[in-house]
Amino acid sequence: MSQPILVFDSGIGGLSVLAEIRKLLPHHDYCYLFDNARLPYGELEEQELISGCVALIDQVVERTHAAIVVVACNTASTVVLPALRATLSIPVVGVVPAIKPAAQLSKSKRIGLLATPGTVKRHYTYELISQFADDCHVELFGSSELVLMAEQKIATGQLDMVRLTQVLSPIVEADLDVLVLGCTHFPMLRDELQQVLGQGVTLLDSGEAIAKRVKTLLAETKSDEQVQEEDAHSNLLMQAFYTKAEISEGLATTLVDCGFSTLERITTINSNG
């Protein structure tokens, strides 16, 4: 059995990243860990976020013998990566908002970043804008409600389009031609976002870039024999771990439809979060 790729998020948003990784690495085993007991992360204090995430991920890495960790959460990536890399001995990949490609793609030089309040307010985000989009007018939009709406869509199959239109009204009024989806939950709402914003706004996320980075790192750390063995691997292991006491039937169905054969609640021992 190969060492799995561990994808981590606060909720179901990381499934959008997982899907991109599986396109490039279809024969690999995967673990999906989501800390839905503390969702949404954009509302947490930094130290609480760091201690909780590191304890939880470290516990699952030790249990699953993961080969690599993908922190498929923009909010966590902006604060947790240094502590996580100091704790783990395996590669850790984070999510970077697609500011650079957005600036390159924009014709009007008016772009937006839609993310959680935590991502929007952090210095790291402003550094990205200064470094890669200094020739653009950049509007920042923070919303935790959209995270919960994405979770609700997966759990129930329903979405309040009237409320979504209200939430997105400042973006419509901003007259942008490119919008960066700076939260991995938001690609789950891509069709609905496009419907409200119109075809004149291009939506960008980081899923494909993350997948390419994961493939590169695995190639650097594995021998040719290991790669060939995994390519021939047919009985894929797909495990999902969550932290909330219960998950909805709709979410469980979604995970099973994604190929997960094991769904298990996990609790942290050393976390103060």
Swiss-Prot record:
PANTHER family: GLUTAMATE RACEMASE. It comes from Shewanella sp. (strain ANA-3). Provides the (R)-glutamate required for cell wall biosynthesis. It catalyses: L-glutamate = D-glutamate. The keyword Cell wall biogenesis/degradation applies. Substrate binds at residues 9-10, 41-42, 74-75, 184-185. Disulfide bonds: none annotated. The gene is murI. The active site is at residues 73, 183. This is Glutamate racemase. Pathway: Cell wall biogenesis; peptidoglycan biosynthesis. Belongs to the aspartate/glutamate racemases family. Its EC number is 5.1.1.3. Pfam families: Asp_Glu_race. Gene3D superfamilies: 3.40.50.1860. HAMAP family: Glu_racemase (MF_00258). Keywords: Cell shape, Cell wall biogenesis/degradation, Isomerase, Peptidoglycan synthesis. One of its GO terms (molecular function) is glutamate racemase activity. One of its GO terms (biological process) is peptidoglycan biosynthetic process.
